[in-house]
Amino acid sequence: MDKLKIIGNGPLNGEIRVSGAKNAALPILCAGLLTADTMRFTNVPMLRDIATTQKLLQGMGVRVMTDNVHEMEITASHLDSLVAPYELVKTMRASILVLGPTLARFGEATVSLPGGCAIGSRPVDQHIKGLVAMGAEVSIEHGYVKARAKRLRGARIVMDMVTVGGTENLLMAATLAEGTTILENAAREPEVTDLANCLVAMGAKISGIGTDRLVIEGVDKLHGAEYAVMPDRIEAGTFLVAGAMTRGHVVLKNAAPKSMEAVLDKLRETGALIECGDDWISLDMKQRPKAVNFRTLPYPAFPTDMQAQLMTLNCVADGAGVVTETIFENRFMHVPELNRMGANIEVEGNTAIVKGVDKLSGATVMATDLRASASLVIAGLVAEGETIVDRIYHLDRGYEYIEKKLGAVGALIERVS
């Protein structure tokens, strides 16, 4: 099993190209199920979760071509199977996103209840509630969601909670429904907006994009299109935190600064000098970062997927910071590992109190989920001595060539078996 070996060695300096967004690419690839035509996607990150999605779609009978790196062509002219099996869904929660488009276009779908991260229950009840409101018959049998509908019909659906996956599934399903669907309390995340823009490129009629009220007029069919996946705001944020922690100067290319203003604001609060253009971000940190308080909330507030990384910055910051996690339970699994490296973090319920220390010490640590593993990598960049991060298969789900990208800006980091 691969590990990362890191030796702390001072500031990061240089340019990093940000990859396409995993959390946008996954639903956008599933949107290919909505048309018999060929979809061509660019800026697709080469990640474990993308490979899993490719396997899932191919298993259903979709033709997937990946002739060029970061490009993918999908043709779902017919499906051999309307089932998404447990063997694949258990490894990645986003597999549930085939439910809406498959049901809408083919009249039935069977999808295993999801697995994926160990950071909380993340139920799919809002997905099911919405599909039932649109006329589907839905049952849960032997761990599978089974849905049928001759043709979905438009409905007004009020989400009980903000759910990114639920919004995406219902948005895709509504594009082929009869009549108008209104999604109230819809997620506003940039990745949802990216999916909506892709659907519009395919011929969908959607208004309110970027707001919490999406109005979708169903059409009889969608057509093929070419679409570029948006840059990954979480990968970008991770590299910016690494730059700030190491007191370096990093410039991110192919970035989307407007999608991550809450993160940039917090980094400015730590003392970082940040400049942005349309597709680039520059961070320069001259001194020890200042500790910051922050709370995770749905977009446009601070994202839960950046919680572990900014908490890690607090570990070596001047002062103390209070971190409150409101999105997922059980999302402090990186805390014991950071404390093993010399951090001073106390957890009370969904709040962590982080007191900055002068230095961290290298240690062997274990990744528990995708973003926790990223936090341990950036902790290793500033720790004295050698850090070994184990179980980095979590990291490979969401970061493309992280050791190469960090190595190119001065980090001493390598993948070892």
Swiss-Prot record:
Keyword Cell cycle: yes
Active site (UniProt): C117
Gene Ontology terms for molecular function: UDP-N-acetylglucosamine 1-carboxyvinyltransferase activity
Listed SUPFAM superfamilies: EPT/RTPC-like (SSF55205)
Top-level EC class as recorded in UniProt: transferase
Domain of life of the source: Bacteria
Record Pfam families: EPSP_synthase
Binding site for UDP-N-acetyl-alpha-D-glucosamine: R93, R122, P123, V124, D125, Q126, D305, I327
Subcellular location: Cytoplasm
Keywords, alphabetical: Cell cycle, Cell division, Cell shape, Cell wall biogenesis/degradation, Cytoplasm, Peptidoglycan synthesis, Pyruvate, Transferase
Any GO BP: peptidoglycan biosynthetic process
Catalytic activity: phosphoenolpyruvate + UDP-N-acetyl-alpha-D-glucosamine = UDP-N-acetyl-3-O-(1-carboxyvinyl)-alpha-D-glucosamine + phosphate
Residues annotated for phosphoenolpyruvate binding in this entry: K22, N23
GO CC terms of this entry: cytoplasm
InterPro entries reported in the protein's UniProt record: Enolpyruvate_Tfrase_dom (IPR001986), Enolpyruvate_Tfrase_sf (IPR036968), MurA_subfamily (IPR050068), RNA3'P_cycl/enolpyr_Trfase_a/b (IPR013792), UDP_GlcNAc_COvinyl_MurA (IPR005750)
Residues modified to 2-(S-cysteinyl)pyruvic acid O-phosphothioketal: C117
Primary localization class, coarse: cytoplasm
EC number: 2.5.1.7
Pathway(s) per entry: Cell wall biogenesis; peptidoglycan biosynthesis
Function: Cell wall formation. Adds enolpyruvyl to UDP-N-acetylglucosamine.
NCBIfam families: murA (TIGR01072), PRK09369.1 (NF006873)
Family statement: Belongs to the EPSP synthase family. MurA subfamily.
PANTHER family: UDP-N-ACETYLGLUCOSAMINE 1-CARBOXYVINYLTRANSFERASE
Protein known as: UDP-N-acetylglucosamine 1-carboxyvinyltransferase
Biological source species: Chromobacterium violaceum (strain ATCC 12472 / DSM 30191 / JCM 1249 / CCUG 213 / NBRC 12614 / NCIMB 9131 / NCTC 9757 / MK)
